[in-house]
Amino acid sequence: MAKKAVLLVNLGSPESPSVPDVRRYLREFLGDERVLDLSAPLRWLLLEGIILRTRPKRSAHAYAKVWTPDGSPLIATSRQVREKLAARTSVPVALAMRYGQPSIASVLAQLVAAGIDDILLFPQYPHYAMSSWETVVAKVLAEAKKFSPAPRFTVVQPFYAEAGYIDALVAAARPYLEKPYDHLLFSYHGLPVSHLRKADSSRVHCMTAPHCCETCSPAHATCYRAQIFHTARAFAARAGLDPSRWSVSFQSRLAGEPWLEPYTDHELERLPGAGKKNLLVITPAFTADCLETLEEIRIAGREAFLTAGGKTFTHIPCLNDHPKFIDFLVGHVDAWLAGTPASTNASAL
């Protein structure tokens, strides 16, 4: 009889906000071919010749601003989520990070040593991107091949459209939506435009027309932009928001090539002049608060908005360990255990 377990996987974090630890983390993260999709020699040259010479010090300073007594906020929150999910299910729940510790390789080794041979892989990414959901699945399956026999995996697909996820987002945001505000900005992690085109197997839909994300297409199954707009529209409908009171932007871009627009930092400077002086910002692509939400939005974003003439700035926390999000996770696990998962076998990936 199969021995089951759940594996949650999120992005990861440096072990500390020190420059050497941040450099080590960035080398692993940006060395991933699905993150910097360049040829191996070019990726190495860019990393070692430019990025790792300058960015670790700047990033370490940013990490230090959000570091907690429990360490990385992303990892601390992810542990809380794991514990709360484990308390409500009958099978073990493990936690791994795509980069850094606890590593996917080490956690899989522990599960296999414990006799686990049937795993529900739950990437903590609502939307598909080759640099997030896909790289987690690919890494897990690659590491699993090192075991004989390898565990069987069922993979939870991107859940951007699932009612339980949307309901959790709205429930977490409701206390903020009930207070006076002028505008709600959905700030999603950005992606290079080239990543969207590469993910479109048809090569003829994504980013080929102004309204490609609003035109029904099989390409949307792997289109990050279409999926984030679906989430935003579903949230707005569920929360009863007027279309004039919300918009979408993209953060965390790197230099060197076109990224999805509009850029969040540009919008934060523009909105006060457009009369949107009391701003709410929500970051639905992140299930747990992290550097990109806490430092880039809550600290730097607030400063930029207020400097541009804004009056009030509120970042709505990520789902973190919100009860509705835990309910959503439990629902997936229960369905999998019952043999009716809202997910698919990933052996072909």
Regions found by a protein language model. Name each.
Residues 1-349:
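Active-site-proximal alpha-helix that buttresses catalytic centers in soluble enzyme cores
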